[in-house]
Amino acid sequence: MASKGAGVPLSRKSYRLTSETERPRVTGIVHEKLLNDYLHRIFSSPDHATPTATSRKPLNFQNLPEHLDQLLQVDSEDEESQGQVEGRLGPSTVVLDHTGGFEGLLLVDDDLLGVIGHSNFGTIRSTTCVYKGKWVYEVLISSQGLMQIGWCTINCRFNQEEGVGDTHNSYAYDGNRVRKWNVTTTNYGKAWAAGDIVSCLIDLDDGTLSFCLNGVSLGTAFENLSRGLGMAYFPAISLSFKESVAFNFGSRPLRYPVAGYRPLQDPPCADLTRAQRLLGCFRAVLSVELDPMEGRLVEKESSEWQLQGQPTVLLTLAHIFHRFAPLLHQVYLVEAVLMSFLLGIVEKATPAQAQSAVHQILDLLWLFMEDYEVQDCLKQLMMSLLRLYRFSPIVPDLGLQIHYLRLTIAILRHQKSRKFLLSNVLFDVLRSVVFFYIKSPLRVEEAGLQELIPTTWWPHRSSREGKDSAEDRAEAAEERPRRRAYERGCQRLKKRIEVVEALQVQILKLLLDNKDDNGGEASRYIFLTKFRKFLQENASGRGNMPMLCPPEYMVCFLHRLISALRYYWDEYKASNPRASCSEEAYIPPQVFYNGKVDYFDLQRLGGLLSHLRKTLKDDLASKANIVIDPLELQATTMDDLDEDEEPAPAAAQRPVQALAVGGALPLPRPGWLSSPTLGRANRFLSTAAVSLMTPRRPLSTSEKVKVRTLSVEQRTREDIEGSHWNEGLLLGRPPEEPEQPLTENSLLEVLDGAIMMYNLSVHQQLGKMVGVSDDVNEYATALRDTEDKIRRCPKRRKDILAELTKSQKVFSEKLDHLSRRLAWVHATVYSQEKMLDIYWLLRVCLRTIEHGDRTGSLFAFMPEFYLSVAINSYSALKNYFGPVHSMEELPGYEETLTRLAAILAKHFADTRIVGTDIRDSLMQALASYVCYPHSLRAVERIPEEQRVAMVRSLLAPYEQRPWAQTNWILVRLWRGCGFGYRYTRLPHLLKTKPEDASLPSLQKPCPSTLLQQHMADLLRQGPDVAPSFLNSVLNQLNWAFSEFIGMIQEIQQAAERLERNFVDSRQLKVCATCFDLSVSLLRVLEMTITLVPEIFLDWARPTSEMLLRRLAQLLNQVLNRVTAERNLFDRVVTLRLPGLESVDHYPILVAVTGILVRLLVHGPSSETERATSVLLADPCFQLRSISYLLGQPEPPAPGAALPAPDRKRFSLQSYADYISAEELAQVEQMLAHLTSASAQAAAASLPTSEEDLCPICYAHPISAVFQPCGHKSCKACIDQHLMNNKDCFFCKATIVSVEDWEKGASASATSSAA
């Protein structure tokens, strides 16, 4: 650095040392006296009084270096004593011992101070130990899980189950379980949270050990520590999987120093003194101005200082920075000196003044220091700033967070610094996403929420379903002032949080600036590259789980990103009227197939990208003018095939595979981890099936474009925004898309990334945060029940009253705490503004799906997460935000609901979508959609053509496809119209709990007559629609009920064994599911018979008789199994096993009764006679099963004991709240009708020889013969067999025809052909 003095004095970095004695004069330097006064004012000695002008030595730039040497001289004792402290053994630079002092698998940072658990319970210690004196070190808690932090000796041996504190000479504090550990464990301290700092103190003079949490002492934890020969203590930690911390042994200033205790690593005292003196000189430069005209010095505020290019000032600063720059490579000095100085500016000045001052200071750093020095200094500065922000305590006014964010903004406003930090630091070295996070306080009293929200309130839910008594209303009136006071406190909190959020949005606006491209790439395009890599690391399933961005950070980052994105989107709209506003935003479909945006290995709707490019290459050419080179396509395919055959060295370099060897591994810190998929993605993209040609004019429809997919790092601004008719990201526009641009292409990519972020982890985190609200509801219910018990408690039972009062106090205190926490959660996660952000994402996804659908087969290129986000964001708005804010108040809510309904109705059976998971998600979303009245009405509002197509898909045969959800949807459309089918929860179960009221299955019946009519019309239309659908329903009913009976037989056998045994809960769940399926299939049959009875009863149809016989057979089977007293079903129901709560007589019997009533009571007499004859002809029919429905006892068999008189019998008459009098009258009419008809049938029946009975069913006489094999059966059996199989039941020969057969006569005319 000393060689930089040559050259012109005022050139770039040429005036570092400008004594230049060989030159006769220096132009521009002030006269000697003023220069002497100025330099003495700047470089005054801090230890002595200011000498008089006559006694002090004259100063000029020739003797200034000598003066500086004297000024910066410190006591030699300070430097010599560095690292030579009694009571400490080991290196002076204290780090974690990743070579030998560990147990288990751990990930260690590059600086050897941060550690992440990667095994069950890993342990690591430091390289330095202490045996005498008072020592302290700090641990920055990054995650609040299971950890034991403290001290151990070198002889302690740990394993995957035992860590620090589990051996005799190791001591630990565990804030997760709020305990201290030394072989045994006792309660100690407070619970810690992510963002806290634990100070570990050891006093080896007194033999005590204690801890502090965020600077507050938790008291002495252990006494009488073992001391003496061979007893030295190492800092140590044991942590479970995915937990992470960072240590500060003294390499940085302690956040909470403790008087009398020394950090394990000594601070650089001598360099610190020098740096502080140089900083004082620098401050003096900023507060003094030269007035050459008057020949005097002018004092002024440092915030008003401007660099005006005066040679004297520049040379002075050059001398300061010549000494200051080498010191700023030390982390300790950057944080203790430079950071403190900059924070002081931010705290004292207005935001505008602070930004101007910081901007000038950064200008000076870049001017007087080498680039590598500035870059290293900025890197350390931002890392320190992020640590300060992340680990600062929450105070009522959030003042600390505001100061740190204001300084961050001031630094990022400096263009050169911003671009360097974006390119090399913000996403590569540190988790910059932390800057957008507002941590939730675990201890509300420390965050000052008690003062901010002095009055607490929580909703009092009535225990009565949907009914509020006068007492409840009076209580609500009494609570109203309290609720309003609570809401005012919440608003005060929200306003303070909004200040922090606004600063965070400012940071992102700076990072998304695209007008700072002078002298290099604009910030926005650097951000896009880093943002895409960040998404890739978090999207990859093979990434390192502990290194992924925590979901709570993602939530905050997403909301700030949406705010900044919409700001720039609408700003572009203001200057370009033809563009779209952010309310009309969507992602054009060509982004998904032109290869300009990397979607890594994420699944597309149509499957793998390589497969789609092969199968849809003709559609790409015809619709998007994109040609795929077959040779490159083949290369891509081979590259995918060879992916698993990587060379051994390459595979060994993968981080995940390297971890398998065990031990503590140095962990690189680019972002969260260099994703293992990055190499594959880039290799795929570089050999992708498209090559680039930039046309200079608009393309005609006959021209085809060959495009080449570029990796993220290779793209330029032109590749994104486009130029000279090259549309950039929008290359390959389909004819359905408008020509005018929506907005800047770079903003489209940011929007695409925001949608991907929501899918990665934001939705799951939104669901987790609802837990606080659930806790409030549970405690509120418990408090209400306790207060009721206190009111009912007899006065003489003072002991019970005391216990109840104690419980009441505990619940009240817990609710006070939770209600304040809930206010914080509502302000940071579930506010109205956050709800609008998620709603905006939902509408963006809907428009994107609609535009993609118009491209026909190219819709298959869309990533699956667009449909997932559309489904999940609506679910979040309804279930997570809905209890706090009404969805109906959202702008355009009804229209959005209808558009989502149209997408679900169209795409749940879309053949272009092949992924099983996404198809299941669509089906489940539609099933949930039809459960709620407002969303069901939205389905009814979609165009009739789409409604009919949806119902047609629902009526497709159930074979060879997932049919349970389809059947559930049909059942929901019928619920409320069926026989005794108006219940929300089964009659034998308890009433609905308030917290369960939002579940789809517990919604009140809301049938859709419109969709029922569509179903009836479709079943009447084609000759094959109804038979194929009903045949599949009957097959599934036969399977489901048979499986159910088989399972309850096993359960009954297990229950009757004398030895102790347990029934597998999974078996019980499957059993209950089969029962529910049987009931729902019966309900679908009831709906079909009610809507279109002629399918079964009009025997002019070729399949009606066969369907009716099969239906009668199944109904009799169900009735016989369920209605027989003291049989298998009856015994299992009386067991009331957990898991079989839904198994009961009522749901299945009323479903069967509904079908029988429709067949035998409603309709003309000719139809009822046909149904009656078929039902009675079935050999399984028993009249007692029908009598059972009305509670009539079964007549005892001869010699059998009479039934117990007090035995409770099932009867539909007992369910007056669920079955109307009219329905009961119909059952009685049906019973009378069947009693009469069965008596007549018994009198008219003739005995049949066994040889004449059908050899398949042994119930009906032989009436058909198969050709050509000649085997015989009844017509019902062969018709049913031919519905599913064309081979002979007996010999497996192919049946050509079936002919009528009568005993003693030859075959007659052919009745049907196979």
UniProtKB/Swiss-Prot annotation:
It catalyses: S-ubiquitinyl-[E2 ubiquitin-conjugating enzyme]-L-cysteine + [acceptor protein]-L-lysine = [E2 ubiquitin-conjugating enzyme]-L-cysteine + N(6)-ubiquitinyl-[acceptor protein]-L-lysine. Residues 74-254 form the B30.2/SPRY domain. Transmembrane segments: none annotated. A zinc finger (RING-type) spans 1254-1292. Zn(2+) 2 binds at residues 1269, 1271, 1288, 1291. The modification Asymmetric dimethylarginine is found at residue 683. Pathway: Protein modification; protein ubiquitination. Residues 462-481 have a biased composition (Basic and acidic residues). The modification N-acetylalanine is found at residue 2. Zn(2+) 1 binds at residues 1254, 1257, 1274, 1277. Gene3D superfamilies: 2.60.120.920, Zinc/RING finger domain, C3HC4 (zinc finger) (3.30.40.10). InterPro entries: B30.2/SPRY, B30.2/SPRY_sf, ConA-like_dom_sf, RNF123/RSPRY1-like, SPRY_dom, SPRY_RNF123, Znf_RING, Znf_RING/FYVE/PHD. CDD domains: RING-HC_RNF123, SPRY_RNF123. Its EC number is 2.3.2.27. PROSITE patterns: B302_SPRY (PS50188), ZF_RING_2 (PS50089). Residues 460-481 are annotated as: Disordered. Its main location: cytoplasm. GO terms for cellular component: cytoplasm. Component of the KPC complex composed of RNF123/KPC1 and UBAC1/KPC2. Interacts with UBAC1 and CDKN1B via its N-terminal domain. Interacts with RIGI (via N-terminus) and IFIH1 (via N-terminus). This is E3 ubiquitin-protein ligase RNF123.
